[in-house]
């Protein structure tokens, strides 16, 4: 790799490469993948699929994130939120990051092919390319609907977990994908409002930059309503029970409250608080799905 390891402590270099994988994002993805796995079967997930399947998904996601760092390094350098990232700050070279990304992706694919099935490997590869190439390389700079169109790649983990456990696609995991797909726009647009000036400086056509904050707030509100409706569908189709319904209603009502506060502009930090809550929303919603699933099995 084009990195002079001797110039920096190995521990610092290790942390830089770990940062390239966006570990916090990958952890949230793995939670949804795990839920997809456990919801797919009543018999339990084989430990090899559970461990190596999720590791393969995580490695591929980390590889895609590293490519994102490479492509966005000039954008990251002019944004306060990202200017200290390893490539933007010059601590890791583009060649080193791309090599790292390729190694992660190949290892991830090898694990998926060995311990799960070809369908999961292909779907994971499609998700990787969708995020790293289509979204990062094109959509992000081409349209203010970048998040909406590109959100499908980031919504795939529960489907990947499901297919890893079963070897086939069915309606239930697609519904989980739909939940994340509906969650993505209000999640990212809230951050885009908070970082509007930085996105404008970086010449990224995020919705608040191209259409203004009011327009974006209206769409956040509309998507949050849609998300609340979609999140109830697992109960409607008898995929989940009463516990999940109560959690989905409570979490969704709170998300909707933040969207209304953001729309009205009555609190100075509503945008970033909406963004932060959206992360907890998705985490808790999928945990509720999982707990409810095992509660139903024991009734």
Curated annotation (Swiss-Prot):
One of its GO terms (cellular component) is plasma membrane. Its main location: membrane. Its EC number is 2.5.1.141. PROSITE patterns: UBIA. Pfam families: UbiA (PF01040). The chain crosses the membrane at residues 25-45, 47-67, 95-115, 119-139, 147-167, 173-193, 226-246, 279-299. Gene3D superfamilies: UbiA prenyltransferase. Keywords: Cell inner membrane, Cell membrane, Heme biosynthesis, Membrane, Transferase, Transmembrane, Transmembrane helix. It is a multi-pass membrane protein. It is found in: Cell inner membrane. GO terms for molecular function: protoheme IX farnesyltransferase activity. It comes from the Bacteria. Pathway: Porphyrin-containing compound metabolism; heme O biosynthesis; heme O from protoheme: step 1/1. One of its GO terms (biological process) is heme O biosynthetic process. It catalyses: heme b + (2E,6E)-farnesyl diphosphate + H2O = Fe(II)-heme o + diphosphate. NCBIfam families: cyoE_ctaB, PRK04375.1-2. HAMAP family: CyoE_CtaB. Converts heme B (protoheme IX) to heme O by substitution of the vinyl group on carbon 2 of heme B porphyrin ring with a hydroxyethyl farnesyl side group. Belongs to the UbiA prenyltransferase family. Protoheme IX farnesyltransferase subfamily. Carbon 2 of the heme B porphyrin ring is defined according to the Fischer nomenclature. This is Protoheme IX farnesyltransferase 1. It comes from Pseudomonas fluorescens (strain Pf0-1).
